[in-house]
Amino acid sequence: MKTLQKDLTTGNPGKIIFNFTLPIFIGNVFQQFYSMADTIIVGKFVGTKALAAVGSTGTIMFLINGFILGMTAGFTVLTAQKFGAGDMKAMRKTVGNAAILAIIMSLIMTVLGMMAMKPLLGIMKTPDDIFKDAYAYIMVICGGIAAQMLYNFLSSVLRALGNSKVPLYFLILAALLNIVLDMVFIIAFHMGAAGAAWATVISQGISGILCLVYIVKAVPILHLHKEDWRPSGHLLKIQLAVGIPMALQYSITAIGTMMVQTALNLLGSTQVAAFTAANKIEQIVTQAYVAMGTTMATYCAQNIGAGKIKRIRQGFKSITIMGSIYSVVVAAIIMTVGKYMTYLFLSGDLTEIMHSVDIYLKCVGTFFIPLTVVNVYRNGIQGMGYGLLPMMAGVAELVGRGVVAMIAAGQKSYFGVCMASPAAWILASALLIVMYYYVIHQNEKRFAKYADEG
């Protein structure tokens, strides 16, 4: 069988980065279909208030998903570094230890999440007319955290080895299954918002199981031995030192988005529904930035393991150009015709809602280039083994998003709510560019010293 694992330390950086990013982007878009299918079917067949209920939990969903994504990606940075260095024995050991951490964290997150949801929705001032549906939806999601952890961990392991295609295949299948289950649970069984959550959890679980079956059947270098499951204090310390800051970084961002959601909730369920629809449109086009970030984490991890700092510089240059071109194109599209996608989510007279959707898309589309920098540089720095520095950029995001959200809440300004994320991107991108040059300079000196000693 032809191996799908890929060494990212050789070949043309731009071409390799593009080829690795494309399947991740497609996979991320299909993953968005999980929530988009929920949004469309809930909005069309249950109603505006049910759509607002699902949308009002979006920031909590981001907190859960982001924490899992950041943590599993961080746990497997060391895996990519060992793979890049050609040390397969050490690579397997990192996978075994990361799996132990993932299991423990999924249990902790499930218990804490289910305990915290009701008070958290209250703190966020979720409107009374959508509270019941919002609570039902998010509790099912919390109960399915293990399913999310399974897929994200195994896909992170495969990507650490340069395989971005297989997670895509299983994700596409799961996304299609999610749509079918949405129709069954919501339309046929009339389960409402909770039915949408069940469809999402079941689909994610199946995607994770398929990844596991693939690894067992087709990736012999990931067949773990008994000794690989033995906890190593040294490895666990390194993995936690990268994984926890990456997870917390998403959490910090999520706290900022919760502040935005709180400000939005003060404007009523109609504006919440408009913001939800617009945010879904934004999330589809911005998955390219998430994919670029995922690519750079693996690319930088493998190349730092191989000691190729110049190649890392070349990679950053190539992907920054790609991201900037993409930003200009998609911004032009969503700022002109994006509002018409509102018809995907809602029916009836949408004049007021479409106007609000248009405001949101124009606000965020104007600042897509800073968003490119945030995703690419943050993940690349993390891939080189730095956990705390990118987290500081997350704090900058929190400050930018939080300050604007508080001002918007005080003035009950929808435009202010829409400008919260752009403010966060501008602050974080400026800080990350400075961090990038610092990290590159430090590693150039480090590897030059090793060369001199050799």
Label the model's feature ranges.
Residues 1-21, 79-144, 188-244, 300-367, ...:
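Short alpha-helical transmembrane segments in multi-pass integral membrane proteins
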Residues 8-46, 59-74, 78, 103-110, ...:
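N-terminal transmembrane alpha-helices
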Residues 19-38, 140, 151, 174, ...:
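Transmembrane helical elements of multi-pass membrane transporters/channels
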Residues 22, 26, 57-60, 100, ...:
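Hydrophobic residues within alpha-helical transmembrane segments
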Residues 33-51, 121-128, 184-191, 251-284, ...:
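Helix-terminus/linker motif at the lipid-water interface of multi-pass membrane proteins
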Residues 51-111, 148-167, 274-338, 371-393:
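Small-residue-rich hydrophobic transmembrane alpha-helices
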Residues 63-66, 110, 178-182, 208-212, ...:
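Hydrophobic transmembrane alpha-helices of multi-pass small-molecule transporters
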Residues 72, 141-159, 167-175, 196-211, ...:
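Short runs within selected transmembrane alpha-helices of multi-pass transporters and secretion channels
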